[in-house]
Amino acid sequence: METLKITVYIVVTFFVLLFVFGFLSGDPARNPKRKDLE
């Protein structure tokens, strides 16, 4: 049961990190005017 809990925590953390990195990397793509001005 402890192993299952650890696995769930790892999976949740992985998805949260994936979402955060995807949001940060997708931010400039959503705001192209910032890139064009520079």
From Swiss-Prot:
Top-level lineage group: Bacteria
Cytoplasmic compartment residues: 25-38
UniProt-annotated location(s): Cellular thylakoid membrane
Listed transmembrane segments: 3-24
Keyword annotations of the record: Formylation, Membrane, Photosynthesis, Photosystem II, Reaction center, Thylakoid, Transmembrane, Transmembrane helix
GO cellular component: photosystem II reaction center; plasma membrane-derived thylakoid membrane
N-formylmethionine sites (modified residues): M1
Observed effect of gene inactivation: Decreased yields of PSII dimers with increased PSII monomers, slightly slower photoautotrophic growth, about 20% less oxygen evolution. Formed PSII dimers are stable.
Quaternary state and interactors: PSII is composed of 1 copy each of membrane proteins PsbA, PsbB, PsbC, PsbD, PsbE, PsbF, PsbH, PsbI, PsbJ, PsbK, PsbL, PsbM, PsbT, PsbX, PsbY, PsbZ, Psb30/Ycf12, peripheral proteins PsbO, CyanoQ (PsbQ), PsbU, PsbV and a large number of cofactors. It forms dimeric complexes. Part of a photosystem II (PSII) assembly intermediate complex PSII-I; crystallized from a strain deleted of psbJ, it forms monomeric PSII before addition of the oxygen evolving complex. PSII-I includes 3 assembly factors not found in mature PSII (Psb27, Psb28 and Psb34).
Cofactor-binding details, from the entry: PSII binds multiple chlorophylls, carotenoids and specific lipids.
Gene this chain is encoded by: psbI
Family: Belongs to the PsbI family.
Name of the protein in question: Photosystem II reaction center protein I
